[in-house]
Swiss-Prot record:
Its main location: secreted. It is found in: Secreted. The modification Histidine amide is found at H57. The cysteine framework is XI (C-C-CC-CC-C-C). Belongs to the conotoxin I2 superfamily. Keywords: Amidation, Cleavage on pair of basic residues, Disulfide bond, Secreted, Signal, Toxin. This is Conotoxin Im11.4. Disulfide bonds join C27-C41, C34-C46, C40-C50, C45-C54. InterPro entries: Conotoxin-I_CS, Conotoxin_I2. Expressed by the venom duct. The keyword Transferase does not apply.
Length: 64
């Protein structure tokens, strides 16, 4: 009985460890917030949002 309980506990521990590794290595998809390029799947964090490419947003200033 003790061997069976230890085996089940060991298997559950391995499953929990694999789930933890999978969650910590997840990257952020395009359109979601980020804090650095390494958070994004495509490695472009632009204005705290994951983007496929980083372009300048807004209009140019015009001088009169």
């Amino acid at each position: 009985m003790m061997f069976r309980l230890t085996s089940v506990s060991c298997i559950l521990l391995v499953i929990a460890f694999l789930n933890l590794v999978g969650l910590t290595n997840a990257c952020t998809s395009e359109g979601y917030s980020c804090s650095s390029d390494s958070n994004c799947c495509k490695n472009v964090c632009c204005w705290n949002v994951c983007e496929s490419h980083c372009g300048h947003h807004g209009k140019r200033a015009t001088f009169q």
